[in-house]
Amino acid sequence: RQVKFPRTEEITKILENEAKEGEQPIAEIDKGGEDAETDRSKRHKGTRGHIDYRGKTYLAPLTTVGNLPFRRICKGFGVDITCSEMAIATNLLQGQHTEWALLKRHPCEDLFGIQLAGNRSDILGRAAEIVSRECETDFIDLNMGCPIDMAYNNGGGSALMGHPKKISRIVRTMHYVTDCDVTVKFRTGINKNDNVAHTLIPQFEEWGAALGTLHGRSRQQRYTKLADWEYIAQCKKTTNRMPL
């Protein structure tokens, strides 16, 4: 099956011209003028901005744990927002059935998101664009927290924390190509004693992120030691409108 990705092609061209014209605010890029926005709204029925995340319990995405049966159990215990396990953008574009199965949503999941992982804005843009078209999802989440070697050594997951310019391209691309919210999940940083999340959080919002989820450990810590709740509180103070 051959699929077209018109929005990804549009934003890729815009970003390629940035070196000459300078970075534009995401709102300006996304609207493209009143006429363009009117045309776009006719072609796509969007859901962006309809979720009030504040005061809700969020079952954060976690590979091999947050599968559909587990999420159903958690919904029974009162969780408000659920999210799929991490899906690799490249695998989705290759049409791998096992990867697409991760995106299945149960009817009880009234607020549901899909998490994507990758390291290239064009690949993640295409994946986000087709997921936005083909799947029932309220938001699409970017994985910047996975610490496993397979993801990290390929430049994805928590490795992105060391490349702010790449994050900018990815988040802005995903925001442009979808009509639903784009959210981000990330860690404190890569190394234990080198926290960088607080410097990135204000930029996430500028780039179009609607929600941030912070895992209070570095990539180096993986899942060991206690989360740094003091640093989480510090990061919370850096947000403006974006819930953390």
For the regions a language model picked out, list residue spans one by one:
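Flavin-dependent oxidoreductase catalytic cores
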Residues: R1-L244
